Regions:
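Residue-level signal for the start and early helices of compact helical domains
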Residues: 12-15, 115
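A compositional/structural signature for long, glycine/proline-rich flexible linkers
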Residues: 30-485
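Bacterial N-terminal signal peptides that target proteins for export
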Residues: 1-12
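Bacterial Sec-dependent N-terminal signal peptides
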Residues: 17-35
């Protein structure tokens, strides 16, 4: 990857996470009722901080890949929306209210996709912070906020590498402090007021908290999201790391309300001390522990029965069983080895199949089957997506809410069938249930007939641990490629 160009940092658009859904609608304000935003800004300025607005917006990860802004599409979770924090509004645009920017979506879209060069992320000094004053999403199966090292500077090699590794556990709907879950208590975390302070420094965090209190915001809705300065090399210039911050959501109860939330243009505040301060860094955050000791192993015999039933049903065509393995290592492992993990989050697991191609013959298709990890209790939701190998572009997918019950036609009368699933990927599905049609385009929004592809799997957030399940407690999802003999 090319080195960062410090001279244009303020105008580079840097987004943590993004999705393969439509581009921005007209902006709408996201107001937080329990406090006064203008008073908060004034209080921050009176506390010897300078402020800079940063857009918090939805974009299309595959479109970024197509535009040459990313080297690949980062294994986007097909059908799941993401939002991200930008580096900043360019310095030549003076603005105090992001919604006062005329034609904001169009201008941001132009900056995001139209500027030359690869996206680089943005840099923070050790005493700076990013502050989000926001509404959480409307009701959905899952949401989270997460910070990442985008480019990591490795001293031994004297270069940056694109790693996209998380530096802290996600702040998710089971852990976030909001007006509906004050101080992290159980309650309703959806469509609630919240504040997130992203910083490495205790002193900066305390001053921001005091400013929020003076503006009428309750301490019960304030979340401190620690940047571990022992891991993230903070500062500005070519020998420092770049970071991004993003927001994941999945399976809205009301799709229209969810889409409005995703499309809304809101703002984060970059907070910078006006004068030097004595640094007081937070220690590295403790990570939530994966696993409960309870496994899915007792479902192994039923899973084998399902395998045999699938092979028998499609015995008129050739079958090739593909291996499933861990796709992405955890970020704390990857960053030590300089590995790219495409925005890996500890709230899920990442599995993938071997590569294959998928033509358009009616006898050529992919059958995916396994344990429904949501039904087994090991995940809040699970899903699988179809990816191009070259671009890691997720072009089609299916969720556990959609494939529930798919195994019962193969195992009639088996009481364990409800814990299993079967789905199909093909170029044409007609009216088949639990079948996903795989497009060939346009561009990277499809995968060509002869292009190498794979199936990627996720299982998000075990309810009892509030983090992703442990790999060794799951039975891996399986893939069979069928085609004419």
């Amino acid at each position: 990857m090319p080195r960062l160009l410090p001279a244009i940092l303020s105008s580079i658009i840097s987004v943590a996470l993004i999705s393969a859904i439509a581009s921005c609608a007209a902006p709408s304000k996201t107001k937080v009722s329990s406090g006064d935003m203008e008073t908060f800004r004034a209080s921050l300025e009176n506390s010897d901080f300078t402020l800079k607005l940063a857009p918090f917006i939805h974009v299309d990860l595959i479109k970024l890949y197509e535009a040459g802004k990313l080297a690949n599409a980062a294994g986007n979770n097909a059908g799941a929306p993401y939002k991200g924090v930008f580096g900043a509004i360019p310095e030549n645009i003076e603005i105090k209210d992001i919604n006062a920017l005329s034609n904001a979506p169009e201008k941001i879209d132009s900056l995001l996709y139209g500027t030359p060069g690869l996206m680089q992320g943005w840099q923070l000094n050790p005493d700076e912070a990013i502050v989000l004053v926001a509404k959480t999403p409307p009701e959905c199966a899952y949401f989270s906020y997460c910070g990442f090292i985008f480019y990591k500077y490795y001293e031994q090699e004297k270069q940056r590498k694109w790693v996209w590794t998380s530096f802290n556990d996600p702040l998710n709907n089971l852990t976030i402090k909001t007006s509906g879950t004050p101080n992290g208590a159980k309650g309703n975390p959806f469509n609630q007021d919240t504040i997130i302070i992203v910083t490495a420094d205790k002193g900066t965090e305390q001053r921001i908290r005091s400013a929020a209190a003076s503006a009428g915001y309750s301490a019960d809705i304030i979340n401190t999201y620690v940047i571990p300065s022992s891991m993230v090399k903070m500062g500005t210039g070519p020998e420092f790391d770049t970071i991004v911050f993003g927001h994941r959501m999945a399976l809205f109860a009301d799709e229209k309300a969810g889409q409005e939330y995703v499309n809304a243009v809101s703002a984060a505040i970059r907070v910078t001390p006006k004068s030097p301060v004595k640094l007081d860094p937070f220690p590295a955050p403790e990570l939530r522990v994966r696993g409960t000791g309870k496994t899915e192993v007792d479902l192994q015999p039923a899973l084998e029965d399902l395998r045999q039933a699938i092979l028998a049903k499609h015995s008129n065509v050739s079958a090739k069983e593909l291996e499933t393995s861990v796709w992405l290592p955890e970020s704390y492992d990857a960053v030590q080895r300089g590995l790219y993990v495409a925005g890996e989050s500890r709230d899920t697991i990442y599995l993938r199949s071997d590569t294959f191609t998928l033509g358009d013959d009616t006898n050529e298709f992919i059958i995916v089957y396994g344990v429904n990890h949501a039904a087994s209790g090991k995940a809040t939701y699970a899903n699988c997506s179809f990816y191009g190998e070259a671009g890691w572009n997720g072009v089609a997918g299916i969720y556990s809410t959609e494939y529930t019950g798919g195994a019962e036609q193969y195992l009639p009368g088996n009481p364990l069938a409800k814990y299993l699933y079967v789905c199909k990927f093909a170029r044409s599905c007609d009216s088949e249930k639990t079948c996903v049609a795989v497009p060939t385009g346009p561009k990277a929004h499809g995968v060509g007939l002869d292009e190498p592809a794979f199936i990627g799997f996720r299982a998000y957030m075990e309810p009892s641990t509030k983090v992703g399940p442990c790999y060794t407690e799951l039975l891996y999802d399986r893939v069979i490629k069928f085609n004419s003999r």
